[in-house]
């Protein structure tokens, strides 16, 4: 076996840092360092540390910001249909008025699931982090008690009294991203040696 792929994992929430560390221990082909950083903090960490790594994995908006700011490949952990379905079922079980709020990577999947399973759910897409607060204020005024969201609106929802359900990535989503990172790096190396 060749050298280990050096992966920097930048997670937008603590649970994903823990998941990354646990999963890294199961693989002998990677050296994964996990750090906590959401959007701008994640970008700062990436800029500070990328020179010591071959590739970066992160999630959603944080991954997108990092990809625009560093010269090494960035793999988005992504959001799995199963991840969203678990959150929808959790929200349904609260028996409260709930909505899905997030960037299109979340809301597109949520719309698909809700259409197929005929789950009546209000779904709101945001394009920038600044939109989240004003939209949450409107949801509060309209009587929403629960919101499925990513890390960007999570804390503000708690602050104004809406119960947030954080969309978390499953081990399967993380495994797929790490596999993609290893494949991307191996492809890069094979092209260098042609």
Give short role names for the model-derived ranges.
Residues 192-194:
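Conserved small/polar residues in nucleotide/adenosyl-binding loops
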Residues 66-84, 155-176:
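A short, gly/pro- and small-residue-rich
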Residues 29-48, 79-87, 119-138:
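A short, well-structured beta->alpha microelement
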Residues 9-15, 35-39, 58-61, 78-80, ...:
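Structural motif
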Residues 83-92, 110, 131-136, 173-182:
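Short, charged, surface-exposed secondary-structure boundary motifs
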Residues 30-31, 65-104, 115-123:
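A broadly used, surface-exposed interaction patch
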Residues 46-78:
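Helix-enriched interaction subdomains in cytosolic or periplasmic regions
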Residues 2-23:
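N-terminal basic/disordered segments at the start of proteins
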């Amino acid at each position: 076996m060749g050298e280990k792929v050096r992966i920097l994992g930048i997670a937008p929430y603590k649970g994903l840092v823990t998941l990354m560390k646990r999963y890294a221990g199961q693989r002998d082909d990677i050296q994964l360092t996990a750090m906590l950083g959401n959007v701008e903090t994640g970008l700062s960490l990436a800029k500070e540390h990328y020179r010591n790594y071959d590739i970066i994995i992160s999630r959603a908006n944080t991954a997108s910001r990092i990809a625009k700011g560093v010269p090494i490949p960035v793999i988005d952990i992504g959001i799995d249909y199963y991840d969203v379905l678990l959150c929808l079922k959790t929200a349904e079980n609260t028996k409260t008025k709930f909505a899905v709020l997030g960037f299109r990577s979340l809301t597109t999947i949520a719309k698909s699931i809700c259409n197929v399973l005929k789950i009546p759910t209000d779904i709101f897409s945001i394009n920038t982090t600044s939109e989240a607060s004003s939209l949450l204020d409107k949801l509060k005024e309209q009587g929403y008690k629960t919101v499925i969201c990513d890390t960007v609106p999570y804390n503000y929802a708690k602050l104004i009294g809406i119960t947030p359900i954080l969309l978390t990535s499953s081990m399967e989503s993380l495994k797929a991203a790490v596999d993609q990172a290893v494949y991307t790096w191996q492809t890069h190396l094979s092209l260098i040696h042609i």
